[in-house]
């Protein structure tokens, strides 16, 4: 797993690409592109399997966790997908999901988020979960 600290402009670039309706290839390309860009900029990449504790820690530090999930459970689509986690408690996780009609503060269970993160390997052949943590500017 990669945990990546990136700048806000990198997140905007992801959002702009995904907002244009590009799909699976963009999600896969963007993750590779960001990792390469991060390495070149000297950002710290932590090779570990991110979990809900990493997401909770980021939220506690007022940081923005972006998580790549697989869309099968949430949207019945066979594609990787980026979401932003906005809140978490003992039972639920709140996400901003640009693919969802509601968009903001979509509530999912903790177990469903873990499953969607794990489904990346099962359905998309992405070897590891991907979590990007951005600092608020």
Predicted regions and their residues:
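Short, catalytically relevant binding-site loops at active-site mouths
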Residues: 2, 73-74
